[in-house]
Design a protein with these regions (language model features):
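Positively charged n-region of N-terminal signal peptides that target proteins for export
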Residues: 1-6, 21-22
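C-terminal motif of bacterial Sec signal peptides marking the signal peptidase cleavage site
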Residues: 15-19
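Beta-rich interaction/scaffold domains
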Residues: 21-154
Length: 154
């Protein structure tokens, strides 16, 4: 009886290692997109309220209103213009500037983006008074260096 169980177990294992895939399948195309398709910005500040658990001041993040977006895929540039929304308090409106905003962008499917030439990491507060460069690498390995420029109107 034990011998039969071992034989059955070996048979099940042998069948489980068999692949259902056919050989000589066609190769699927690799994503070749290395473009920036949209841009966004936020302003973060320390609010007056405290977090109950820690007692630390609450960090508030509000999205800036995008008023213009010019994307040039051939030149690999994106120019973003943002405005301070009306729901900001007068105190916070006066504090918003390009020295401390958070910028994020949307890129092509399966692409990877890295900062170049000392540019700040996207998604963190940074100085956007000057243009920054980022390399967008497509899944097929092609890389394009993009320049992101931001403008703020109050």
């Amino acid at each position: 009886m034990k011998f039969i169980k071992i034989i059955l177990a070996m048979l099940v294992m042998a069948l489980s290692f068999n692949s259902c895939l056919e050989s000589n399948l066609e190769d699927l195309p690799t994503f070749d997109g290395n473009d920036i398709t949209a841009g966004y910005a936020w302003y973060r500040y320390v609010g007056e309220d405290k977090i109950n658990v820690s007692g630390q001041p609450q960090v508030i993040q509000k999205q800036l209103q995008k008023t213009a977006e010019a994307i040039d895929n051939k030149a690999a540039t994106i120019n973003l213009t943002f405005a301070v929304p009306s729901n900001f308090s007068d105190k916070e409106k006066s504090n918003v500037n390009l020295n401390n905003i958070v910028v994020a962008v949307q890129i092509s499917s399966a692409a990877v983006m890295t900062p170049v030439e000392g540019s700040p990491a996207l998604g963190t507060p940074a100085d956007w008074t000057t243009p920054h460069k980022y390399a967008v690498k497509a899944a097929n390995g092609e890389t394009k260096v993009w320049t992101i420029t931001c403008t703020l109107t109050k």
